[in-house]
């Protein structure tokens, strides 16, 4: 993450930590260049207006050096011409400030899926295959389509089988801070997924007073 706004950077880092991601934070281009030169990253989130330079120059050098790490630009510029320039310089996507964290996470997932390819991003548990790019669950040749939040919830469980997730944790992962939702919303989505997993080798188990976890059926 290349961002000089400490409050925003802290919020982004904390949000991605909930997803199990490790985030290095650079406040300027010099630190960002040092990080990129010594470490391989899955994704770069890049602010444009930085105290020691223009993020677009960093992006141009990044691509000139044949570095294929995907870059999502965080920008306050909303003009179409600005966005076209960013894409032409090699940005994989952009998010306009102020942004919704749920949208930022969704764009990151989409870019990473394109980068890795559909086959590499499929997850399998107990004979059930999750294809995030197609938004489907497949078991015994039976394909179930997933809506956006259903997909996000399945990804959380499939990425960490047997791990217990509280309702509050799942609410933080599925909904933005601006959305007024209750724990009942999580119960509704878990109920939908249980129906789609019925008859497969996987199930979402309720752990009393703690939350939910993905387990293999006995």
Q: How would you describe each model-predicted region?
A:
Residues 41, 67, 113-116, 137, ...:
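Generic structural signal for secondary-structure transition and capping sites
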Residues 100-113, 145-155, 167, 180-198, ...:
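DNA-recognition element of transcription regulators
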Residues 173-178:
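Short helix-coil junctions and helix-kink-helix linkers
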């Amino acid at each position: 993450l290349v961002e000089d706004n400490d409050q925003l950077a802290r919020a982004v880092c904390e949000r991605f930590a909930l997803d199990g991601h490790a985030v290095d934070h650079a406040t300027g281009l010099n630190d960002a260049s040092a990080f990129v030169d010594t470490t391989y990253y899955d994704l770069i989130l890049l602010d444009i207006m930085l105290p020691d330079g223009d993020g677009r120059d960093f992006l141009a050098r990044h691509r000139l050096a044949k570095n294929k790490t995907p870059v999502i630009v965080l920008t306050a510029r909303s003009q179409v011409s600005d966005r076209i320039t960013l894409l032409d310089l090699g940005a994989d996507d952009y998010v306009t400030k102020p942004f919704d964290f749920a949208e930022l996470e969704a764009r990151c997932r989409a870019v990473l899926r394109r980068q890795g390819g559909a086959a590499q991003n499929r997850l399998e548990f107990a004979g059930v295959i999750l294809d995030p790019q197609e938004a489907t669950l497949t078991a015994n040749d039976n394909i179930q389509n997933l809506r956006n939040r259903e997909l996000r919830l399945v990804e959380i469980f499939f990425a960490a089988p047997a791990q217990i997730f509280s309702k509050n944790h799942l609410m933080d992962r599925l909904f933005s801070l601006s959305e007024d939702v209750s724990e009942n919303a999580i119960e509704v989505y878990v109920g939908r997924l249980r129906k789609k997993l019925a008859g497969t080798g996987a199930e979402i188990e309720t752990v009393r007073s703690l939350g939910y976890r993905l387990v293999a059926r006995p």
